[in-house]
């Protein structure tokens, strides 16, 4: 079995009727495929949108609401109804499901990140299928992941999945928008996610969901940099999930980095919030970015911000102004200033095990398009 542990992300458009309401037949089809894969020995996680779609009608809304409070209320009602649909269908095959609602803070806070990882590990080891969504009812912008594409990639990286599958209404990444460009061709295999790939992703998306192809590509960066390959394929076929697991479905395959980031490095790269800035000289910049060395105090030119021992800072090349990466400091800001002022600074500010270099691929995640 090539892909034992698989994370599936199912978007709103793959779960709803034309009027935006939840399609029970589509949910049933998804659970049947999950059951077949589970019985074949796969460990599965489902990241599912659709809470708002499942709940807005029950609150008397004629169509999907647009106001934040209305959407949060609809999600509060719909999350239970959606889970009931999944749970009922899976129990018919004697499969236990579990609900987990996450926010960005569950990834940013290292203790909560560890707790979420442990809970998911136990569920998978006990043969349950975790069903995950963002906690839309209470989340605020500062703690919001933003879309389930990103959430699914974060989860796939966290549990070190063997494959992440995006099920959508577009059967992969095209060179243009296939809905309007007859010359657009699907890319079957993507080795590296670069600016050209990002530009190609600026087209297709549907009105019911919140994420188009661009969010999927940026999410794929998180997964592939963490060692998890990604497959984008259509949800329109009745056996699309099974075919994706067997690599017989038409779609776009994103190759994972051969040496994916470990859990600690994932946290540093994607979630750790910087509390300050450090500027270094040319020698220190080369030692960090080219030779995998620790950051010595002797290479520091300037420091800015209020940070304490153990906090995360961003390091810049003083000469070029380029961001080199992030790391955990061994000294607070005031102690560091005193040592730099004495001009006798010796020792290590950031050890290499507490450091992550920002690659061009990772940098794209923090670029506005």
Curated annotation (Swiss-Prot):
Pathway per its UniProt entry is: Amino-acid biosynthesis; L-proline biosynthesis; L-glutamate 5-semialdehyde from L-glutamate: step 1/2
| UniProt xrefs under PROSITE patterns | GLUTAMATE_5_KINASE, PUA
Q: Name one GO biological process term.
A: L-proline biosynthetic process
Which reaction(s) does the protein catalyse, per the Swiss-Prot or TrEMBL entry?
L-glutamate + ATP = L-glutamyl 5-phosphate + ADP
Q: Which UniProt keywords apply?
A: Amino-acid biosynthesis, ATP-binding, Cytoplasm, Kinase, Nucleotide-binding, Proline biosynthesis, Transferase
The record lists ATP as bound by 9, 168-169, 210-216
- Protein location: Cytoplasm
- Catalytic activity, EC: 2.7.2.11
Q: Name one GO cellular component term.
A: cytosol
Report a single Gene Ontology molecular function: ATP binding
Question: Where substrate is bound, by residue?
Answer: 49, 136, 148
Q: What biological function has been recorded for the protein in this entry?
A: Catalyzes the transfer of a phosphate group to glutamate to form L-glutamate 5-phosphate.
- Family, per the entry? Belongs to the glutamate 5-kinase family.
Protein name per its UniProtKB record? Glutamate 5-kinase
Q: Which organism is the protein's source?
A: Streptococcus pneumoniae (strain JJA)
Q: Which gene encodes it?
A: proB
């Amino acid at each position: 079995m090539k892909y034992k542990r698989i994370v599936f992300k199912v978007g709103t458009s793959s779960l709803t009727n034309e009027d935006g309401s939840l399609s029970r037949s589509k949910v049933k089809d998804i659970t049947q495929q999950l059951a077949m894969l589970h019985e074949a020995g796969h460990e599965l996680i489902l990241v599912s949108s659709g809470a708002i779609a499942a709940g807005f009608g029950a609150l008397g809304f004629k169509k999907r609401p647009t106001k934040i409070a209305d959407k949060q209320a609809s999600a509060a009602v719909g999350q239970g109804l959606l889970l009931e649909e999944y749970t009922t269908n899976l129990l018919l095959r004697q499969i236990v499901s579990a609900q987990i609602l996450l926010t960005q803070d569950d990834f940013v806070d290292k203790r909560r990140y560890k707790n979420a990882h442990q809970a998911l590990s136990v569920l998978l080891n006990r043969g349950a299928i975790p069903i995950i969504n963002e906690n839309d009812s209470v989340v605020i912008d500062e703690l919001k992941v933003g879309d389930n594409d990103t959430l699914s990639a974060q989860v796939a990286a966290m549990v070190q999945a063997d494959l992440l599958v995006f099920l959508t209404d577009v059967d992969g990444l095209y060179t243009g928008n296939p809905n309007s460009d007859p010359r657009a061709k699907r890319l079957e295999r993507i080795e590296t996610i670069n600016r050209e790939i990002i530009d190609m992703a600026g087209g297709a998306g549907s009105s019911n969901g919140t994420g188009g192809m661009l969010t999927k590509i940026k999410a794929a960066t998180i997964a592939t940099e963490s060692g998890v390959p990604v497959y984008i394929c259509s949800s329109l076929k009745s056996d699309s999930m099974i075919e994706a697991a067997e690599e017989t479905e038409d779609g776009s395959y994103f190759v994972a980095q051969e040496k994916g980031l470990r859990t600690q490095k994932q946290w540093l790269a994607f979630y750790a919030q910087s509390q300050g800035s450090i500027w270094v000289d040319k020698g220190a910049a080369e030692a960090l970015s080219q030779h995998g060395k620790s950051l010595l105090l002797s290479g520091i030119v300037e420091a800015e911000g209020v940070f304490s021992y153990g906090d995360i800072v961003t390091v810049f090349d003083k000469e070029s102004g380029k961001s080199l990466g992030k790391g955990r400091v061994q000294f607070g800001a005031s102690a560091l200033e005193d040592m730099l002022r004495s001009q006798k600074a010796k020792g290590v500010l950031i050890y290499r095990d507490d450091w992550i270099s920002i690659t061009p691929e990772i940098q794209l995640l923090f670029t506005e398009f």
